[in-house]
Amino acid sequence: MAVRSKSSKAWLHEHVNDHYVHMAQKDGYRARAAYKLLEINEKDKLIKPGTVLADLGSAPGSWSQVAAKLTGTSGAVFALDILPMEAIGGVSFIQGDFRENDVLAQFETLLDNRPLDLVICDMAPNMSGNAVSDQARSFYLCELALDFASQHLKTGGSFLVKVFQGAGYQEYMAAMREIFGTVQTRKPEASRNRSSEIYLLGKNKR
């Protein structure tokens, strides 16, 4: 039997005693991350009935669950991930790498010339334990998401992305400011205090 490290034991203890984990189980969300999006949306009103949005790196699907409830039948939610994701009512899921032409073609077919109001991205790489390489891989994913948003969002659209503060953060903020009229930071209560994660919100795409 594998011996758990002190850090994994601490994570397990925190997870078992996590208020948001219990709430997610009670409310039927697939992950506690749902409450991060709910809190941000409460403040910024990004998702409302009729919103058309793409959820990048969607698995296991808690952000797509929230989005589907908020957009209602008049909106549309497109979820994309390399990993499989169990079906969610009101969500069109494409399994594949959103950099690839065939995946983009599927997305554009489903979008059917509707303007894309919002791109949301809660992606993170599989962490190796090497802080330098993990940070670089994280921002690489963020850059891919920003490129997707810049290509597909309508003028005036919004982009919400998770980043980790550290090397590359200021440069990424600068890149977002070139594309969006305003860029703001959000740190929802459901984000663990010890985590360096923060959400960047770009509004009013140029």
From Swiss-Prot:
Compartments, record wording: Cytoplasm
Binding site for S-adenosyl-L-methionine: G61, W63, D81, D97, D122
GO function term, MF aspect, one: rRNA (uridine-2'-O-)-methyltransferase activity
Main location: cytoplasm
Catalytic reactions of this protein: uridine(2552) in 23S rRNA + S-adenosyl-L-methionine = 2'-O-methyluridine(2552) in 23S rRNA + S-adenosyl-L-homocysteine + H(+)
Keywords, sorted A to Z: Cytoplasm, Methyltransferase, rRNA processing, S-adenosyl-L-methionine, Transferase
Signal peptide: none
Pfam families (UniProt xref): FtsJ
Active site residues according to the UniProt entry: K162 (proton acceptor)
Biological function: Specifically methylates the uridine in position 2552 of 23S rRNA at the 2'-O position of the ribose in the fully assembled 50S ribosomal subunit.
Family recorded in the similarity comment: Belongs to the class I-like SAM-binding methyltransferase superfamily. RNA methyltransferase RlmE family.
Record protein name field: Ribosomal RNA large subunit methyltransferase E
Gene that this polypeptide is encoded by: rlmE
